[in-house]
Amino acid sequence: MSERLRGSAVNAPAFIRFVKKCNEIGVAIHSFRFLRDSELVAAADFAPYTGKEKMHVYSLSKAFTSAAVGIAVDEGILSLDEKVSEIFPDKMPDVISENLSKATLRDILTMQSGHPRCVLDKIIENGDSLKTFFASEFTYEPGTTFIYSTAGTMVC
């Protein structure tokens, strides 16, 4: 492990215990970065990784998105109960269905948009992610049916 733990930003013994526990239970850590006020204050890379490799993060984007939305909610910029049709009026279809009109940011974040399936393939095909997401049929009343959807992350 190459590491840089400095100052009081990271409790080094606790971090080392965390890494050891991860190893014990079979969780492979490739790299670790801790930033405070946009400054890198701690870093660790675990062989064979150097921290310079490009990595696919897949569903990790959902965690980043949820954290960013949480910060915006905390700062009063957004409300989880805000209707997406009010947030993105210029991205709505010409005719807004009853279900789409009910969809909130919370519904999209919790994968309860009302879509019968993930519409990511349509978004990739059509290009405009927001217009495509909202133009897709909202079969279910938002907030009532969970359908795993990567597309919702793009909207939020």
Residue spans for each PLM region:
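Second-shell loop/turn segments in exported
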Residues: 4-6, 93-96, 141-143
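Short, basic/aromatic recognition patches
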Residues: 4-22
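Glycine/charged-rich beta-loop-alpha catalytic/anionic-binding loops adjacent to active sites
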Residues: 44-53, 134-140
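Catalytic-site signature segments of enzymes, centered on catalytic residues
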Residues: 118-156
